[in-house]
A protein has these predicted regions:
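Extracytosolic ligand-binding ectodomains
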Residues: 2-11, 23-395
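Sec/Tat signal peptide C-region and signal peptidase I cleavage site
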Residues: 17-23
């Protein structure tokens, strides 16, 4: 009997140790980003910088998660491919036990992942993917902290109206991002009866020569060229349009914020001046306390100012940690409820919410949309002219 009691006591002690160890396991947050072609690896690295500093913030100033548990980042490369993105999400959820997955940059990847996520139940937060259906399908698991296609298009139609442009050439990659923006531009221009002449040309994201379609653009004599390429095709279009004499005589608008990256002037030393581009953050914008901490930590580590991709990567990871705290659980259903019903601190002064709103605004929080212009070679993006400022969810 004494031996039995000793064994039972030992078993209880071992169980207690195991449970304590389990309770102290880190909270894993998944980061799915493009780190290799045909994805945009520069975007992936910038988002990763933000995510890694977010872990430092969570385990430092924030004081951990659920008491004394640390946060940990698990990173997967989506390669900008849907099949790789789905496999990466499955690994993060099934093998690494991530409580949520964020970092998504390519819309096609995020859309494909969400079809799997709605079955597995672990939520996703789009960091820089804008296709309407990411949130427009109203999946409980799908959240976003980035501008959506209709808002981006509304911003550049404002720009087109202000400039009095009528003939618009749109060169769009055949991805959900590219096709979605082209279709949304057609839709809104018809609804507003803008009487625009739209030339819409498409190309494969893996294209290495855009000369044939750029020659069609040149023959069209547009007032504006909208470059809806991501990563290498976007850079290629800038250079080849200049070689063919389309730009700078005809202005070009880049559909996202690639020109703010430190590498931009290395790639386009002679062709970058005069370009217009979309941005989501102005250095005049007020940061939250967490955002100020991040900006200082980023500059100390990388010797340069943070850009939007890094800021939003940081924000999404700390939002997930806050949601775990508010839910008092890592259970996906509890996490989703917390995300839907609470307010969260991010890098902006405004708090972030994910209301069950109508249409594409479901589970969506958006930064402002800016259109900036470089007016000189090697210009710091923070000195670029602000041509259009279009409201998002942030002030």
């Amino acid at each position: 009997m004494t031996s039995m009691l000793r064994l039972t006591g030992a078993a209880i002690a071992l169980l207690a140790v195991a449970l304590t160890a389990r309770a102290a396991d880190p909270i894993v947050i998944g980061l799915e980003i493009p780190l290799s072609p045909p994805g945009d690896p520069i975007a992936g690295q910038l988002i990763r910088r933000g995510g890694e500093l977010a872990i430092d913030y969570i385990n430092g100033p924030m004081g951990g998660v659920l008491g004394d548990r640390k946060a940990e980042l698990s990173v997967q490369d989506s390669q900008g491919r849907t099949e790789s993105g789905v496999a990466a999400y499955r690994r993060l959820v099934s093998e690494d036990h991530a409580v949520a997955v964020t970092g998504f940059f390519h819309s096609s990847v995020n859309l494909a992942v969400n079809e799997v996520a709605k079955e597995l139940g672990v939520p996703t937060i789009a960091t820089q993917a804008s296709a309407s259906d990411i949130t427009g399908k109203h999946y409980d698991i799908a959240f976003r902290t980035h501008v959506i296609d209709p808002v981006r298009v509304s911003a550049w139609l404002d720009f087109i109206k202000r400039k009095g442009f009528k003939r618009i050439a749109m060169l769009a990659e055949t991805t959900d991002y590219g096709i979605g923006l082209a279709q949304e531009t057609e839709k809104q221009s018809k609804e507003e009866k803008l009487d625009l002449q739209l030339q819409i040309l498409t190309f494969d994201h893996a294209s290495t020569d855009l000369t044939p379609i750029l020659l069609q653009v040149k023959a069209f004599h547009p007032d504006l060229v909208i470059n809806i390429g991501v990563g290498q095709p976007m850079d290629l279009m800038i250079e080849q349009a200049a070689t063919l004499g389309i730009t700078p005589q005809t202005p070009m608008l880049i559909s996202y914020d690639a020109p703010i990256r430190p590498q931009f002037w290395q790639l386009h030393p002679k062709t970058g001046s005069g370009l217009y581009f979309i941005a989501y953050y102005s250095p005049k914008q007020q940061l939250s306390d967490a955002g100020e901490w991040f900006a200082k930590a980023y500059e100390a580590k990388y010797n340069e100012s943070p850009v939007y991709s890094s800021l939003n990567g940081f924000g999404d990871v700390i939002i997930i940690a806050q949601a775990v705290e508010k839910a008092k659980s890592t259970d996906p259903a509890a996490l989703i409820k917390a995300l839907e019903t609470d307010n969260f601190n991010s890098w902006t002064a405004a708090s972030v919410t994910f209301p069950r709103a109508e249409g594409v605004f479901f589970h969506n929080w958006s930064p402002p949309v800016l259109i900036l212009q470089y007016t000189a070679a090697n210009q710091d993006w923070k000195d670029a002219s602000i041509v259009v400022e279009h409201a998002g969810s942030a002030p």
